[in-house]
């Protein structure tokens, strides 16, 4: 009598395991990049919340606010998120500082700044690595 065997051979199982390993190796870096972007977007969102107050202060006073209090926003330690330690306003530059733990290792403790320049009668905002303005009265 001939018996019919059902199931996978060892070779077939090894091939499936190899394919799953390759897919995981490709997906993991993409996932880590995605989580870092999501964490940085929180920093941008919290920093952007201060732009209108900084702009209004500049337009009313002709100089950039020296700190959070002058800008009329909450203190730096009160503006925080799940991944953001604090958001400071210093001479009109809004800087978000990432936490040193619990975030993607590439952005731990890093800072992101938003700063404005007066151009043709309007205020134009920029985003990038931390900057410092030498004088609060400077137009740029």
Residue spans for each PLM region:
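Periplasmic/extracellular, small/polar-rich flexible segments of pilin-like filament-forming proteins
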Residues: 59-140
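Conserved hydrophobic/amphipathic alpha-helical signal-anchor segments
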Residues: 33-75
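N-terminal single-pass transmembrane signal-anchor helix
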Residues: 2-42, 46, 50
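Residue-identity detector for threonine
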Residues: 3, 9, 35, 55, ...
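Generic intrinsically disordered, low-complexity segments enriched for polar/acidic and small residues
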Residues: 5, 28-31, 54-55, 80, ...
């Amino acid at each position: 009598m001939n018996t019919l065997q059902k199931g996978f051979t060892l070779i077939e199982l090894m091939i499936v395991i190899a394919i799953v390993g390759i897919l995981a190796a490709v997906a993991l870096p993409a996932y880590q990049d995605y989580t870092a972007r999501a964490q940085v977007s929180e920093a941008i969102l919290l920093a952007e919340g201060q732009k209108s107050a900084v702009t209004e202060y500049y337009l009313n006073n002709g100089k950039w606010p020296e700190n959070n209090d002058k800008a009329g926003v909450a203190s730096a330690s009160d503006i925080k998120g799940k991944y953001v330690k604090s958001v400071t306003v210093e001479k009109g530059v809004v800087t978000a500082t990432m936490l040193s733990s619990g975030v993607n290792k590439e952005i731990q403790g890093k800072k992101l700044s938003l700063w404005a320049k007066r151009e043709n009668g309007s205020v134009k905002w920029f985003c990038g690595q931390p900057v410092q303005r030498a004088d609060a009265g400077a137009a740029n």
